[in-house]
């Protein structure tokens, strides 16, 4: 039996506990395509909304006009 789950045959996949990994990955990718199929206009709108919300939360937490990240470099400047 081949140890790489992608290269297993259908018959070998029936004998393992996790089943056919390639088929499960295909089902998952189809589900993600259905969820994300709203189009690029909605994606751009969501990106703008998330960026604006992030800036508002950062300002509400005491950041004086710059968006913070969790990096060490930014933390020093945001704490001023």
Swiss-Prot record:
It comes from Ruminococcus flavefaciens. Keywords: Antibiotic, Antimicrobial, Bacteriocin, Lantibiotic, Lipid-binding, Secreted, Thioether bond. There is a cross-link at residues 52-55, 69-74, 71-78 (Beta-methyllanthionine (Thr-Cys)). This is Lantibiotic Flvalpha.c. Lanthionine-containing peptide antibiotic (lantibiotic) only active on Gram-positive bacteria in synergy with Flvbeta peptides, which are encoded by the same operon than Flvalpha.a. Shows antibacterial activity in synergy with Flvbeta.b, Flvbeta.c, Flvbeta.e and Flvbeta.g. Does not show antibacterial activity when tested with Flvbeta.a, Flvbeta.d, Flvbeta.f and Flvbeta.h. The bactericidal activity of lantibiotics is based on depolarization of energized bacterial cytoplasmic membranes, initiated by the formation of aqueous transmembrane pores. The lanthionine formed by Ser-58 and Cys-68 forms a putative lipid II binding motif. Maturation of FlvA1 peptides involves the enzymatic conversion of Thr, and Ser into dehydrated AA and the formation of thioether bonds with cysteines. Modifications are processed by the flavecin synthetase FlvM1. This is followed by membrane translocation and cleavage of the modified precursor. One of its GO terms (cellular component) is extracellular region. One of its GO terms (molecular function) is signaling receptor binding. There is a cross-link at residues 58-68 (Lanthionine (Ser-Cys)).
């Amino acid at each position: 039996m081949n140890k790489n789950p992608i290269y297993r045959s259908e018959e070998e996949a029936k004998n393992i506990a996790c089943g056919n990994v390639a088929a499960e990955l295909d089902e998952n990718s189809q589900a993600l395509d259905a969820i994300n199929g709203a189009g690029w206009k909605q994606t751009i709108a969501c990106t703008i909304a998330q960026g604006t919300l992030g800036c508002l939360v950062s300002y509400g937490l005491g950041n004086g006009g710059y968006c913070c990240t969790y990096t060490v470099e930014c933390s020093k400047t945001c704490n001023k």
